[in-house]
From Swiss-Prot:
UniProt-recorded name of the protein: Ribosome-recycling factor
Family statement drawn from the similarity comment of this UniProt entry: Belongs to the RRF family.
Matching NCBIfam families: frr
GO molecular function, one term: ribosomal large subunit binding
Gene symbol of the encoding locus: frr
GO biological process, one term: cytoplasmic translational termination
Function: Responsible for the release of ribosomes from messenger RNA at the termination of protein biosynthesis. May increase the efficiency of translation by recycling ribosomes from one round of translation to another.
Tagged with keyword Protein biosynthesis: yes
InterPro entries noted in UniProt: Ribosome_recyc_fac (IPR002661), Ribosome_recyc_fac_dom (IPR023584), RRF_sf (IPR036191)
Assigned keywords, A-Z: Cytoplasm, Protein biosynthesis
Subcellular localization: Cytoplasm
GO CC terms: cytosol
Length: 185
């Protein structure tokens, strides 16, 4: 029973860390990366379809993304979807290939992005602490039902705290790497 609680807490904490990594991958740095456009949807025959399903996105070089649209008639719609996104990008089409040059980030914008990234990381830490709280309350319920002893409860809480510390450390490492990437010129 205790192992189930610990396993569940660990899985949920890992999912929180992965969700943070995924969220931070969408924050624009000075470098071109295909995941930058992963949040963009295109109107494809009346349905909002992710860009990655209607086109191939590759990083042509450090500052340019190249998008090859599978259906030529969608080129205009893809271009418009990129322009309408809040990424501040200006796509240029050349036949079926759309090139998206990434303008260099200003110092002020970098600092704003660092603040945003820190906020996301704090949200991840809060999620991990909430998972710890849930696991500890599950343990308290078992203790109240006399299904586990106080020693087992204390030992399990210590182990859950170790899981929490490890997850928070991972979040801090991800944050530090992203901040470093953002502040590179």
């Amino acid at each position: 029973m205790i192992n189930d609680i610990k396993k569940d807490a660990q899985e949920r904490m890992e999912k929180s860390v992965e969700a943070l990594k995924n969220s931070l991958s969408k924050v624009r740095t000075g470098r071109a990366h295909p995941s930058l456009l992963s949040g963009i949807s295109v109107d494809y025959y009346g349905a909002a379809t992710p860009l990655t399903q209607v086109a191939n996105v590759i990083a042509e070089d450090a500052r340019t993304l190249a998008i090859t649209v599978f259906d030529k008639e969608l080129t205009q719609k893809v271009e418009k979807a990129i322009m309408m996104s809040d990424l501040g990008l200006n796509p240029m089409s050349a036949g079926t290939v759309i090139r998206v040059p990434l303008p260099p980030l200003t110092e002020e914008r970098r600092k704003d992005l660092v603040k945003i990234v820190r906020g996301e990381a704090e949200g991840g830490r809060v999620a991990v602490r909430n998972i710890r709280r849930d696991a500890n309350s599950d343990l308290k319920a078992l203790l109240k039902e006399k299904e586990i002893s106080e020693d087992e409860d204390r030992k399990a809480q210590d182990e859950i705290q170790k899981l929490t510390d490890a997850a928070v450390k991972k979040i801090d490492d991800v944050l530090a790497a992203k901040e470093k990437e953002l502040m590179e010129v």
